[in-house]
Amino acid sequence: MSNITISQLLALSLAKFNQCDISTKHDLQMIICDVLGVDKTYLYINLDKQLDKNTLKKIDEKILRLLAGEPLAYILGYKYFWNQKLYVTKDTLIPRADTETVVATVLDDIQNKDAQLKILDLGTGTGAIALALAAELANSQVVAVDLYQQSLDVAKKNAQANNITNVKFIQSSWYTNLDTDKFDIIVSNPPYIDLADTNIDQSVKDYEPARALFAADNGLADIRIIISQAKDFLNLGGFIYIEHGFTQADAITALFSQCNFTDIKIVKDLNNNDRCTKAQLGYL
């Protein structure tokens, strides 16, 4: 394949996919933009531009990965979340738009954005939640925890790339390596998919780290640890926010109640699915 235009390349590439929908076209456009180092506006006004052999080879290599089912974020090496460009690797879960619901909920609950809050993000991965909150709450201090050093390395790189300095990174299994300081807010997007769940997209199963996705006890094992120990790390009147699957809200509400949390509320995502449950330690 040589001396073809961007428009021709798009048409030929789309024809290789069984499902030629808007999403596939978007992914192909993003791959071409990434290789060319341009944005989609450039692409639209230069559809007749011819591509040289070396450029075509680079694009074709990435398209083959897309055909194999590899998620676009891993092919590009990044994903945008809360207006931040986040690097991703095979060691990290790909940030989802649904998780922005959790960030928005936390921010909506904070009346004074200039307050000096202490925030804990458990299972930070790419740092998506921690960095979004740190960027919006410049006077607050965020502690981002992950069990895996490879994930923390990615999160640190993302903090540096986005010029965010009010985040401290700690390698820990949930609360294990934390000191006795308490937090005003705890937030987590932990593994919550049931080990027996068969409704997972094949690309997710094949490419994303299982350790960040699946949990025992109907997907509740890690959530149970986070909630049951939260009172030792949360200030009185502080809030905890847990992202979860859309069928788990009732079980998580029960866990919060058993641990004497109050003001328990379920938050829906943009698809109107239960996505996050929040609770307060102390007052109603």
From Swiss-Prot:
It comes from the Bacteria. One of its GO terms (molecular function) is nucleic acid binding. Coiled coil: none annotated. It catalyses: L-glutaminyl-[peptide chain release factor] + S-adenosyl-L-methionine = N(5)-methyl-L-glutaminyl-[peptide chain release factor] + S-adenosyl-L-homocysteine + H(+). S-adenosyl-L-methionine binds at residues 123-127, 146, 174, 189. Keywords: Methyltransferase, S-adenosyl-L-methionine, Transferase. Methylates the class 1 translation termination release factors RF1/PrfA and RF2/PrfB on the glutamine residue of the universally conserved GGQ motif. PANTHER family: HEMK METHYLTRANSFERASE (PTHR18895), MTRF1L RELEASE FACTOR GLUTAMINE METHYLTRANSFERASE (PTHR18895:SF74). This is Release factor glutamine methyltransferase. It comes from Francisella tularensis subsp. tularensis (strain SCHU S4 / Schu 4).
